[in-house]
């Protein structure tokens, strides 16, 4: 089998994770920490790309990586327009949306730009894979009870789809042939209904929908939320933080560290026990609802993300949902590996690269 060498880039707010893979095998994985003073020199996140590019190339050189031997560069997908899942070639339309922050400004927007900047000089392809804006929801799933307020698909697409593919392989099937309920449990929690390779419904784990998590509120009583918003006690930013960042375990028990909460549970703390069980309860309830989306025809339930290392949490969830389907646990997440595998599927011609096309304010994914 021929070897494809792939450089993978995953930018964060103060660091850039890089990996070099020979097919699926990691040759190098490193987290480059950026000095906050250096980062602070740039008014816009997007202006950091040249600095980060040079830093990446220096690190690769220091490890003896000859970039002329690369076959592709793959970056973390940023805040683009809604697109279907898959591996996309970085093109001019995508670069424009990433640079202009079409759906928001975030360090992940640098992923596609850095991949393109490095790949173009080597005359090799640049890709992104399954960004958080992946949207494969069916029309019926978009409807909310208020006109003009559609439900949106924002979830852990990269890890959910990567783990779903691994589970399909373990079950000796193609991802596109299975119905799976995949739950990513980390700082946020999302439950996706995967129908034959498409995530046809999923809770918006960022903007207050679904189970509460270590630092997000999830679905809350809307009437009380409205009253709080107009009480005159809080600014808008404060309310947003209550939903994302200071919600969930942070609000209820004062920490987003699930390990600490689990230790409290093991010591018999009644409040911690109730709250931790409530989080598991809400995850199970979301899984149960998602099972109805797939008419109860579920090949497996998958639990993944950092919280899937918690035996207490996993056991609580299993007790409530294992009657629906077998529960398969894949703890943690490996974004670099997932990005490499997405690029590899295209290089091996197992799937065609998709093209990001903007037409009349719409995005069309063309495979």
Swiss-Prot record:
Cellular component GO terms held in the UniProt record: cytoplasm
Keywords from the UniProt entry: ATP-binding, Cytoplasm, Kinase, Nucleotide-binding, Transferase
Organism superkingdom: Bacteria
Keyword hit for Disulfide bond: no
Single GO MF annotation: acetate kinase activity
One of the GO BP terms on file: acetate metabolic process
Disulfide bonds: none
Protein localization: Cytoplasm
Keyword hit for Kinase: yes
Main localization category: cytoplasm
Family: Belongs to the acetokinase family.
Full protein name: Probable butyrate kinase
Organism: Bacillus anthracis
Gene that this polypeptide is encoded by: buk
